[in-house]
From Swiss-Prot:
Domain of life (superkingdom): Bacteria
Name of the featured protein: Endoribonuclease YbeY
Keyword Zinc among UniProt keywords: yes
Keyword terms of this UniProt record: Cytoplasm, Endonuclease, Hydrolase, Metal-binding, Nuclease, Ribosome biogenesis, rRNA processing, Zinc
Amino acid sequence: MSIEFINESGYDGVNEEMLIDVCSYALGCLDVNPDAECTITAVDLDTIADLHVRWMDLEGPTDVMSFPMDELTPGASAGRPDAVEAGPAMLGDIVLCPEFAQRQATAAGHSLGHELALLTVHGCLHLLGYDHTTAAEEKEMFGLQNELLADWYEDLAARGVSYQPKPSGPKAFPDAAERAELDKEVPGGGI
């Protein structure tokens, strides 16, 4: 798996190694072809706000945006990078805003590192065609997101690696409804 990280945010506390690790773990668990590529870019509030209005027609900053190279259907095989005959090698781009994520982490009672890991897994799922526009999609995507994130922490422990303690608070592994409540506290998120 080739994952490039670019930090254009100017924000302290962004752990490049951790974000590449969680992204690689999530994509590996989803059987994505090991030759697949993606990029994670950390940007500032102005940049994410500009992208948000340009691509989503929504004003203000947000936490994460994903730009898949190809439109994929979750679980489908034709043309996917995890198909027997590998599809496109470039999955796309995940754009994170650490400054916005810090606001969410503070409101949720956990670290910036955990919030960025959660947002990275969320972005990976979007790159693979998952979405949360319906209640059924929300349930599937947030369930898978939380499972992957929790399993990643277990994998880290098994490897003897620790980027930050696994949070145990009620907002650490939110379902869609819990995340919607957090978005009311920190307007603009909306993962």
